[in-house]
């Protein structure tokens, strides 16, 4: 740790730099007022950034100085024979040792938590871009998502494409698409776009384009999404025409429609219409005037594609279509089922196997319901009864080798290992 004198010298030096930087900022502001060209504007931005950086650094140094002074005061105090810290409220020492001091200075309580994203602002921002850059960014954050997040964690990245530009004084300038790649400790602003929020809004606004380009997240690929959507219209129409176990059977054959899943969905649509939120209605209205490909009922060729890139909640543009939020919940249960199967067949202790299980459904449910709508569990049951068995049979379980071929190869491995060593052969 720096000594008291070093910190004081550092603070003095930064204060001098800050005075100079503020003077340069004033000069830059005057220059922009006189001649507002790109060079002067760029200089002004860099001057502002320099002042902001110096102010942040100076504040940090002053906090360090205060901490150091406080630590020195504590060090000079006689050690309490009970082992208690001077400001601990306990009268007797706890059985737990003292741990880390967590500095919460950087946390801003005015900022909302992740569940309260401003979808209206996020949607308006995304709709201001050309479709090619949105789809390319979606590809990078879904199909190549794991690598993109790993390479850029803790930063705010910018996507750039020739299709996205703005003209300033007749000059074309790139229009960057900003996405924040948070760490577990990051606090996100309501209008800030994270990979999860981006996948949610992009899939919700442009499902037809996602379908046309067949952009599928690996997380959805392994639960057989590609197979599931292949004959989607036949599948959903057959499902809607089927008899619903949650409706009373009609007394006369002419009223058979009254007991179908279609009728249950019509009743559900009436319930959903009563729980609409104004911000999301405004977003849908704005999207309809732009190039978005929205839909009003689940029996639409591209409706299922809002989940192709595994958004972490139901997209707001599809939230008020009966059966769609529940369809997303069905997919999240399939992800949990596949991970449970993978954990069950893996080698390891019960604790290690439990760690491999997932909670996609709980996360999806919590995030979607925080948008102001309660999921109808009966619809999820209907999906599971109709499609669950078929979906599980099309899971990709990472075991494509024929059992007989595996057994033959394993016997050859066992024989060779025993010939050259006395170690136990591993399983293929």
UniProtKB/Swiss-Prot annotation:
Region annotation (Interaction with host DAXX) ranges: 372-428
Modified residue annotations for Phosphoserine: 386
Site description Involved in the inhibition of IFN induction, residues in chain: 386
Region of interest (Interaction with host UBE2I/UBC9), residue spans: 188-191
Start and end residues of each stretch annotated as Chaperone activity: 1-100
Comment on protein domains: The N-terminus is required for chaperone activity and, in trimeric form, this region likely serves in high affinity vRNA panhandle recognition. The N-terminus also contains a coiled coil region, which probably participates in but is insufficient to initiate N trimerization. The YxxL motif is indispensable for the interaction with host MAP1LC3B. The central region is involved in specific RNA-binding. Has distinct cap- and RNA-binding sites so it can bind simultaneously both the vRNA and mRNA cap.
Subunit record text: Homotrimer. Homomultimer. Homomultimerizes and binds to viral genomic RNA to form the nucleocapsid. Interacts with host MAP1LC3B; this interaction participates to the protection of Gn from virus-triggered autophagy. Interacts with host SNAP29; this interaction participates to the protection of glycoprotein N from virus-triggered autophagy. Interacts (via N-terminus) with host RPS19; this interaction probably mediates the loading of the 40S ribosomal subunit on viral capped mRNA during N-mediated translation initiation. Interacts with the viral RdRp. Interacts with host SUMO1 (via N-terminus).
Functional description taken from the UniProt entry: Encapsidates the genome protecting it from nucleases. The encapsidated genomic RNA is termed the nucleocapsid (NC) and serves as template for transcription and replication. The nucleocapsid has a left-handed helical structure. As a trimer, specifically binds and acts as a chaperone to unwind the panhandle structure formed by the viral RNA (vRNA) termini. Involved in the transcription and replication initiation of vRNA by mediating primer annealing. Plays a role in cap snatching by sequestering capped RNAs in P bodies for use by the viral RdRp during transcription initiation.
Protein name: Nucleoprotein
Lineage: Viruses, Riboviria, Orthornavirae, Negarnaviricota, Polyploviricotina
């Amino acid at each position: 740790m720096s000594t008291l004198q070093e910190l004081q010298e550092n603070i003095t030096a930064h204060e001098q730099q800050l005075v100079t930087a503020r003077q340069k900022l004033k000069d830059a502001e005057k220059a922009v007022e006189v001649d507002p060209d790109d060079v002067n504007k760029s200089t002004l931005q860099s001057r502002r950034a320099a002042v902001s950086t110096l102010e942040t650094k100076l504040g940090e140094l002053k906090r360090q100085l205060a901490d150091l002074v406080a630590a020195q005061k504590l060090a000079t105090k006689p050690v309490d024979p009970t082992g208690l810290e001077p400001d601990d409220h306990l009268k007797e020492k706890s059985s737990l040792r003292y741990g880390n001091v967590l500095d919460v200075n950087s946390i801003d309580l005015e900022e909302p938590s992740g569940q309260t994203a401003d979808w209206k602002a996020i949607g308006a921002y995304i709709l201001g871009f050309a479709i090619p850059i949105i789809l390319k960014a979606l590809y990078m954050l879904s199909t190549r998502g794991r690598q993109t997040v790993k390479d850029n964690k803790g930063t705010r990245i910018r996507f750039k494409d020739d299709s996205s530009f703005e003209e300033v004084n007749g000059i074309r300038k790139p229009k960057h698409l900003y996405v924040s790649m948070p760490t577990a400790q990051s606090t996100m602003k309501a209008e800030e776009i994270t990979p999860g929020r981006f996948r949610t809004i992009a899939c919700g606004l442009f499902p037809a384009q996602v379908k046309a380009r067949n952009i599928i997240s690996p997380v959805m690929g392994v639960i057989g999404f590609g197979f599931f959507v292949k004959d989607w219209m036949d599948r959903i129409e057959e499902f809607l025409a089927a008899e619903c176990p949650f409706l009373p059977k009609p007394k006369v054959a002419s009223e058979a429609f009254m007991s179908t899943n279609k009728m249950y969905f019509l009743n559900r649509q009436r319930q959903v219409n009563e729980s609409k939120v104004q911000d999301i209605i405004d977003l849908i209205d704005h999207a309809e005037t732009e190039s978005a490909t929205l839909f009003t009922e689940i029996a639409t060729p591209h409706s299922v594609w809002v989940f192709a890139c595994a958004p972490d909640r139901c997209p707001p543009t599809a939230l008020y279509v009966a059966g769609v939020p529940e369809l997303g919940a069905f997919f999240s249960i399939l992800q949990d089922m596949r991970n449970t199967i993978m954990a069950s067949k893996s080698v390891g202790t019960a604790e290690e196997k439990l760690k491999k299980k997932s909670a996609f459904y709980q996360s999806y449910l919590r995030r979607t319901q925080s948008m102001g709508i309660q999921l109808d569990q009966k619809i999820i049951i209907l999906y599971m009864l109709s499609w669950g068995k078929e979906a599980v049979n099309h899971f990709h379980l990472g075991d494509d080798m024929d059992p007989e071929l595996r057994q033959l190869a394993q016997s050859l491995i066992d024989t060779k290992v025993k010939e050259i060593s006395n170690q136990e052969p591993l399983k293929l």
